C-alpha cells in the first residue's frame, strides 16, 4: 500500500512538472513584456536638454549667453528630476575649455561662457547634460558646434579661424575615418534576407567635400544590371533590392573616376520589416522567406522608452503580415518600431517620424524695419494654438547683430532638436530643411534620413525585463559631491571611514559629516551657492583622530566621451543676411 501511494505521488509530481514546464502562449509572453515596459517607462523617465543661444557664431572676447531647458522626453514638459545641469565648452582638440554647473528650477536655467581674448579661435562644441541623461546604455546629451572667430583690427568686418598643431603626445578629438569616396548602405530594418525585397538607403560622402550627390547602377556579381539609383538630398537616397546569396555590386562614377562598392551580405533566413509612412497612417509589414522557421513574434511601437502598441505577427511564406497605425493616436517625434521574438531579442528595427498635429504659431507685433542708434525696441509676441486661441507660454528671445552673425535658414532649433535630432545617431545637417513644407518629397527625404541616421539595433531587453537594468548614474535632485576613499599605499577601498567636511561660504563656515560605504564611496549634498567655494575634507577611522593612510578621490570625470566633428560642422554653408 505504501509503495502504491509513493508511486501515485511520484506520477502526480511528474505530471505537474510537465504542465509548469510548458512554454506560455506567445500572447501571454508579449503581454508581460508590454506590462514590464510600461512599468519601466514610469519608473525611469528620460530627460532631454536644449540650450537656446543668443547667436550662431562668436568672436574671441564675446560672451556666449544661453537659456537652458530640460524636459521629460516622453511628455515634453519641464522636468523636475534633475537640479544640476552640466554645460561644457569643448575646443577643437577635444579638451574641456570651460565648464559650468547650472542650477535648474523646474527644468529652466541660464548661464554664459566668457570667451577670453587669449583663447584660440576655432570650432567649439557646447554640450549639456544631466547625470540622469547618462544613466542609460545609450546616453544622450545636447550638442551644438559654433565657429569662434578672431576679429581683425582693421575697419573692415573681417574674421578668421586659426589652425594650430598639437603635440603628438596630447589627446585629441577623435576624427571620422573616411575614404576618399565612401558609399554606405543601410537596409530597412537593419538586415537583408535572401529572396525578400527590401528598401535600402545609402549615403555618399567624400573626405574632401563631405556629403555629395551622385548616381550609380546596381549589378549582380555576374555583371547583370539590377537597378539604378541616385541621391535625393544631402548625399542620401534609397532603392529597392531583392538580394540573392551573392551580394550585389554598386558602380558609380565621380569626378571622372569609377568606384565599386559591395552591398551587405544577405542572411539565408530571417525577417524583413517594411514601413510606409503616409499622411494619416503608418503601415507596418513583416515578411519572411521559406528557410525561416515558423514562429510568433511581436512588433512593438515605442516612443522615448514607452511602448504605445504591440501587434502579434505569425509570418508565413508568401503571406506577409501587416497592420496599420493611425497617426493621430501616436505621439509626435521619432518612433521606434521593433520586431522582437519570445526571448526578447530585437530581430529588426526601424525609426519613423510622427508629425505633430497642431504646431504653435508665434507672431511678433510692433517691430519696425529701421531703428535709430540706441533707440528702444518694443515687441509683443503672441502665441496661438492651431485654432488661433492664445495660450500662456514661457519664451526666450535672442537678438543678434546681423552684420556679425552667421545665419543658416535650416539650422537646428527647439522643434527639430527635441523631436528629431536628439534621437538620431550622428550629426544632422540643417534639420530644419525637412520641415519647410508638407510635401511627398519632403516626407520621402525625412524617411531616408531616418533610415540612415536611425540605423541601429535598439536594445529592448532592459525595457521588457529580460536583462536587469543598472543605472550608470543616479538622478540629482540637488548638487551632490561624489567621491571614494582608498588606501594611499595599498589602494584598497576603505569602508566605514568617517569624513568631516568644512565649507567656507562668504563669512560663514558650513560643516557636515558622512561615512563611506562598503566600496569606499561617499556622497555629500551641497547647499545652494554661486561661484566657487573652498572646502576641506578629512578622513578619520573609528578610535583615531585622523586616518593618514587614506586618499580622497573626487568623482568629476563622468563626462561623455568626446565625439568626432562632422565635415559639415567644420565647413558650414551660411546664408546671406539678404535672405532673412
Where are these regions (language model features)?
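Ligand-binding face of N-terminal immunoglobulin V-set domains in extracellular IgSF glycoproteins
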Residues: 111-115
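Short amphipathic beta-strand segments in non-cytosolic proteins
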Residues: 85-99, 216-228, 301-308, 398-405, ...
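Contiguous segments within soluble domain cores/interaction surfaces
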Residues: 26-47, 52, 58-59, 63-103, ...
